[in-house]
Amino acid sequence: VELMEKEGVVFKLDTEIGKNYPAVKLVNEFDAVVLCTGSTKPRMLTCEGADLKGVHYAVDFLKANTKSLLDSNLEDRMFISAEGKNVIVVGGGDTGTDCVGTSIRHGCKSVTQLEIMPELSEERMPNNPWPEWPRIKKTDYGQEEAIELYGKDPREYLTTVTKIEGDDMGNVKAVHTVEVDWSTGA
């Protein structure tokens, strides 16, 4: 970042364009504009049982892990531990991959990653030519670690959660899923 600043890149952090910095001013003052965003609010699960003990959102899981790692190399134990747990990650994107990898490094018993979309081809399809962004299957570090450790890809495609079942203490006991059928345009 320092090198980029020395080269003339200006960073405007924690800025709400249109509110505390006019969009027209931004466009007029700079040769190029790059908007970098990140979500601090999770996409909430809407199924029964989403409020049970043991259901954690990625932003909370990853943020606490990173803070504990940077502050104490995880020695303060101020993170949500996946150690010894059977982990279900809902979501197949980069954040889901981070959750898979972090859970493995915690020493989870198993990890399954649910992906609502179909498995993509390893090669470009005719309707996805260059220079479009390639819509191909991407096996990232989290999945690679799972394959190495457990002998199989953790991803379950065309799958979504319908219910999270709890025990008498309010802890997650089971996750109910259903296969998604996109052929009807659902």
Each language-model region and where it sits:
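Mobile, glycine-enriched helix-loop/loop "lid" segments at the mouths of ligand-binding/catalytic clefts
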Residues: 52-66, 181-183
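A residue-level detector for conformationally permissive "hinge/kink" positions
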Residues: 30, 52, 76, 83-85
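Beta1/beta-strand and adjacent pyrophosphate-binding region of the FAD-binding site
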Residues: 80-93
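A Rossmann-like FAD-binding core segment of flavoenzymes
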Residues: 1-44, 66-77, 104-186
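Short glycine- and Lys/Arg-enriched binding-loop motifs that mark or flank ligand-binding interfaces
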Residues: 34, 45, 87-89, 99
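Flavin (primarily FAD) binding-site architecture
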Residues: 36-51, 55-59
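Short glycine/serine/threonine-rich phosphate/pyrophosphate-binding segments
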Residues: 94-100
